[in-house]
């Protein structure tokens, strides 16, 4: 017999927590960014990342597995048709959590969880950009040094 998760749960019962996560995931996929409490955002991140990984597969079985958790067909269609192709080259890390100010009413710590839709830059590309920038910075310095002796010779004459 499976034992329930230890510790605090969102909403009290395990079934309520599942519903909360399903609703938050639906809203995140629909709006691509939502504002929620830190605890909910931290629990939502792996939940959504697993759904996106399944959506990248694109098979009918994957679509049915995702539909078990997200019941709105329009949101499932958006996940498979719009979002999954954007994450084709990314191997995880589909979401980002940004800490916000505490909520005014009860001082609860708040966060914004959003989908990372920007293209990733490889380490090689950043190295190449840094090398190009350093070469560009060295060229003006060498040009100034070359001009300085010529100016000194002109002053002596």
UniProtKB/Swiss-Prot annotation:
A Pfam family per the record: Ribosomal_L17
Biased composition (Acidic residues): 140-157
A Gene Ontology molecular function term of the record: structural constituent of ribosome
InterPro entries for this protein: Ribosomal_bL17, Ribosomal_bL17_CS, Ribosomal_bL17_sf
Record keywords, A-Z: Ribonucleoprotein, Ribosomal protein
Gene3D superfamilies: Ribosomal protein L17
Annotated GO biological process: translation
Keyword Ribosomal protein part of the UniProt annotation: yes
Keyword Ribosomal protein annotated: yes
Family assignment from sequence similarity: Belongs to the bacterial ribosomal protein bL17 family.
Official protein name in the record: Large ribosomal subunit protein bL17
């Amino acid at each position: 017999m499976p034992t329930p998760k230890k510790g605090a749960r969102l909403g009290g019962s395990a079934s309520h927590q599942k519903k909360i996560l399903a609703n938050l995931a639906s809203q995140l996929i629909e709006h691509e960014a939502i504002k929620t409490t830190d605890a909910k955002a931290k629990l939502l991140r792996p939940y959504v990342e697993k759904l996106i990984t399944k959506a990248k597969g694109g098979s009918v079985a994957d679509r049915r597995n995702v539909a078990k958790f997200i019941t709105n067909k329009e949101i499932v269609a958006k996940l498979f048709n719009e979002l999954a192709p954007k994450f084709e080259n990314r191997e995880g890390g589909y979401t980002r959590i940004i800490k916000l100010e505490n909520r005014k009413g009860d001082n609860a710590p708040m966060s914004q969880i959003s989908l990372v839709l920007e293209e990733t830059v490889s380490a090689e590309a950043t190295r190449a950009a840094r090398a190009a920038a350093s070469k560009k910075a060295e060229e003006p310095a060498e040009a100034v040094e070359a001009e300085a002796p010529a100016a000194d010779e002109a002053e002596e004459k």
